[in-house]
Every structure is written in C-alpha cells, then in structure tokens.
Amino acid sequence: MRLDAWDSVKQAWRLDFMDDLRVLLREKFGHQSLRSGQAEVIRPLMAGRPVLAVFPTGGGKSLCYQLPALALEGLTLVISPLIALMKDQVESLTRRGIAAARLDSTMDAEGLRALYEDLDAGRLRMLYIAPERLANERFRERV
C-alpha cells in the first residue's frame, strides 16, 4: 500500500487525536482503554461523519459520543426519549466535572432560566433533550 504525503498527514492527525482521546478517557472517565468497537465508532465521528452504532445494553454507547463531545469544539446535543436516562447521564457527567445539562418537561422556570443562561454563555458541552424538543423552532434557533 502506497501512502502519499496527504495520507501521512491524515494518519498522523488520527494518531494525535486518538492519543488525546486516551488522555480524556483516563482523566475524565477513569478507563484505561476503549471497549471493542468503540474506536470504530469514534473515529468517523471525530472526522465529522455520521455513525449508527448498535451495542447491547451496557456496551459503552454513551462513551462513543461523550468522548468526542469533550474533544471537539462546541455543544453536543444528545437526543434521548427517556427522562430518567437523561438525568442519570447528566448527573454522572457533572460528577466528573463535565458541563452537561438536560432540558425536559420536568424542569421548573428557575431551572429553565439557569439552563438557558448557561447555554447562551457557551458554558455547556453536552445538552440532553427529548426528541420532540427538536420540533420547537425557538429551541432550534437558540442552539
């Protein structure tokens, strides 16, 4: 197999970001290595390509989007139909010092105000929302 100069640059970039991801994996999530299949999901995400990943319950799906969310710039929207799962994920991330929040129907006015303040200030890395939230035009314009 022949690599031209551009392929070498791309390969070096891939290795660099995988090294950075390993550091984040250890420091933020306390894992020494990725599980089987996770790197194959994360690589295209880091390159801006869409991915469909199907893993069993407990197979490490969340880490496949959480790790790139920390490595890449901006806000990552996580669409989840289950409020209980959103709460668990956000609590776990905030315990790790990761700026995450959820936006769901159980929130009171004060919680919504604080969330939108954080969102507008760019303080959030991950925002968990229900699928129907995407139907709200004001929300889509805001994010």
Q: Model-predicted segments: where are they?
A:
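Conserved catalytic network of the ASCE P-loop NTPase/AAA+ motor domain
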Residues: 69-71, 93-95, 117-122
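Loop/turn-to-beta-strand initiation segments
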Residues: 50, 74-77, 123-127
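Walker A/P-loop
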Residues: 48-67, 78-79
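Conserved Walker A/P-loop ATP-binding site and its immediately adjacent core
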Residues: 75-96, 107, 111, 130-133
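Conserved helix/coil segment N-terminal to the catalytic DExD/H
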Residues: 59, 107-143
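Residue-level recognition of beta-strand->loop/alpha-helix junctions
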Residues: 102-104
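Conserved pre-motif I regulatory segment
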Residues: 14-56
